[in-house]
Structure formats: C-alpha cells, structure tokens
Amino acid sequence: MTYSGPAIDTHHHIWLRKDVGWLADPPVPRMFGDYFGIRRDYPVEEFIQDVKPQGVTKSVHVTAMWGPGKALEETRWLQSVADKNGFPHGIVSNVDLADPGVEAALKAMRQAAAEGVH
C-alpha cells in the first residue's frame, strides 16, 4: 500500500538569485557538481506548485547560504515569505558556533523565527 496522506518537506530551499552570492557570482567548481540549472530565482510560489502534487502540507527551509554576515537577513526574509504565503513552516539558519558573538546571533535568529541552526 502506498502512503497518500500529508507530507512534510524537511529540507528545501527557495531564493531570489540576486541574494545568494554563490548563485549570482560567476560559476566556480563546487563539490555538488554543475549547478547551472539552479542559477535562477526559485520563489516560494514555484516551490508550493512543485510539492503540492506530492501532498506536502508543511515545509522546513534550510539556509541557502546567502554569504558571510547575511544569515540573519536571510532568516528575516524567509519569515516575511512565510507570513505572506504560509510556507515555509520552519527555518533552519546558519550561525558560526565558534564566533564570540554566538549568543547574540542565536537570540537574533530566534526572534526572527529560526527553528534551528547548522
């Protein structure tokens, strides 16, 4: 029997290419190979359209690594997207746990609705 109930996508990304340095900058070799096909905007509306047929009703966005010093900005943007569109339901952001300002960074992320960090 095949499962046909609701599903949660526990790791996805959305972005505007202009905000993500490694997508907007000239391509360089990456450990994950050729990424030409994703060097474009992937807005939440398209994500929702892509996952609805699979029964996805909730999702968790994992950082798209906007670049140094931009993690809080990314998290705040994602929360504004969620407030407007209902997706994503959780946000996993990026914080350097070795940074001397880690406590302040974690507090700021929590206020911006981050559910976790990596």
Question: Model segments located where?
Answer:
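Active-site gating/metal-coordination segments in enzymes
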Residues: G69-H118
